[in-house]
């Protein structure tokens, strides 16, 4: 009975119904604005790592679309006549993921890294004059030591989306 009385008694947190409804709406709206992009990332990751997807690859593995994207291609990239696309979803929850890039001097390429909020946090490629070498995508707060010569790329989330674009020359 004491619990029922305490729950029914007004306190500093009790709001009139119209204010409680407005606050609930505002909190729901804020949750949507902040959370929708994370939900979208999860949907994209599940689609792109699905073995039946047209441009699929398991976590921590790159897959390159075979050929140029066309308007009928079932991928999430813009069709054009001079770019080959690739993608990878990284899981950094167990630690850094390393990527080695060869020397590329004869064409434009870029690998864009985004966190789960789809904010770009790093580029590797000719766009930013990257050199051949090994790059480490680091999870938030990681304090370990990398091998000599490895370039660290700090993510703000344990999930990372890599989008590769490579210019192809007409043949």
Question: What annotation goes with each model-predicted range?
Answer:
Residues 1-2:
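Sec-dependent signal peptide recognition
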Residues 10-171:
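A compositional/structural signature for long, glycine/proline-rich flexible linkers
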């Amino acid at each position: 009975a004491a619990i029922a009385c305490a729950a029914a008694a007004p306190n500093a947190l009790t709001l009139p119904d119209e204010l409680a409804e407005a606050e609930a709406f505002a909190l729901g709206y804020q949750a949507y604005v902040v959370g929708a992009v994370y939900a979208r990332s999860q949907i994209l990751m599940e689609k792109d790592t699905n073995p039946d997807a047209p441009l699929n690859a398991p976590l921590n593995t790159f897959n390159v679309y075979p050929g140029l994207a066309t308007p009928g291609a079932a991928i999430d990239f813009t069709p054009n006549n001079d770019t080959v696309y690739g993608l990878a979803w990284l899981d950094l929850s167990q630690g850094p993921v390393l990527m080695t890039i060869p020397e590329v001097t004869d064409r434009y390429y870029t690998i864009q890294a985004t966190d789960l909020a789809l904010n770009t946090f790093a580029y590797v490629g000719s766009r930013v004059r990257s050199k051949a070498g090994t790059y480490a995508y680091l999870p938030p707060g990681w304090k370990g030591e990398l091998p000599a010569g490895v370039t660290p790329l700090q993510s703000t989330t344990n999930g990372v989306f890599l989008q590769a674009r490579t210019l192809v020359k007409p043949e």
